[in-house]
Amino acid sequence: MKINYLGTGAAERIPGIFCNCKLCKYAREKKGREIRTQTQLIIDDVLLIDFPGDSYLHLLQYDLCFADFNSLLISHWHSDHFYGEDLAYRMSGYALDIPNRLTVYGNEAVKTFYQRAFDLEGRQDDTRLHYQVIQPYKCFTIANYTIYPLPAQHGNFSEDCFIFVIDDGKDAFLS
């Protein structure tokens, strides 16, 4: 499996948008590898995991085309992992020449934030985007990957988050 980390930081990023600590000052000065954007990764150039507010930056930084992806796994509803408002720009009227539909996989909590993004737009585009609710411990298949969603506690909530075991038959990856 080829794993490409686009971002490995937390919600506040490094340097933090309002922070003046020693670490953030150092990151601002050195740039490059010292900068940490919000978490997002790609497996084998096929499977996209998480869609944070920094997705647009990742698109520019790594010369990506998110229109090429068919599948998106969302670990949880926090905006540093799922920023649905940007995902809505995949709809017709915003994006042209998209031949495929993106299926977004996540739990019920993520679905609420997904739906909110389209409620703000006043419409949905099911030809471009589809939401698939996934359940803890119930594996499913995307392309040649078997995905095992495992519940995790994150923040003050229980089971609002998934970690994923992703198995391609040769290798397994815990995300």
Placement of each model-derived feature along the sequence:
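N-terminal short leaders/motifs
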Residues: 1-4, 86-91, 117-121
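Active-site neighborhood of divalent metal-dependent phosphoester bond hydrolases
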Residues: 98-102, 108-133
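Phosphate-binding glycine-rich loops and adjacent basic patches that engage nucleotide phosphates
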Residues: 18-23, 69-80, 124-129, 151
